[in-house]
Amino acid sequence: DYEKKGVIVQGITGSYGSLHAKQMIAYGTNVVAGVTPGKGGQKFEGTVPIYNSMQEAVNATNAKISIIFVPAKFFLGAAKDALNSGIKLLVAIPEHVPIRDTMEALDLAKQKGAVIIGPNTPGIMIPELIKIGIMPPMPFKAGKIAVLSKSGTLLYEISDALTNAGFGQSITIGIGGDPVN
């Protein structure tokens, strides 16, 4: 039932966040809210409510999944906001996150019983069902093989080769290319 799970997009009003939020919605991902401090009360694309904090967004939607599209220097604050609000799966797109910030976020996630994918991940995709990240949909086809990779490009290439050979993917996960993830 992953297609029904709500996803919150942190940084939804930024250029990168808005571009990929639109693509995630077009793919079928259930984006239930966005978070950008100072932009609460607005709507993204006329339908997705924007909140000032993750706690407000989680209270309104009961979502357990979030994706972060903020610059690396704001990652730790965004991760803490998400994890302290009850998020259980956090997809961290920013690259070059300071190692100390990543370690602190991972420690908090462990304390909260949550998982962080990334930083510097292309995200997670269940082909033909949901996309939480920046992956292009073309290389992927639904099937039975799970693909995990530290490199986003290799993830796409492996999935494309499998697809072209007639083998689909059950899930694809980019674990993140930063030194610690």
Protein language model features and the residues they cover:
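Catalytic-core regions of core metabolic enzymes
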Residues: 1-181
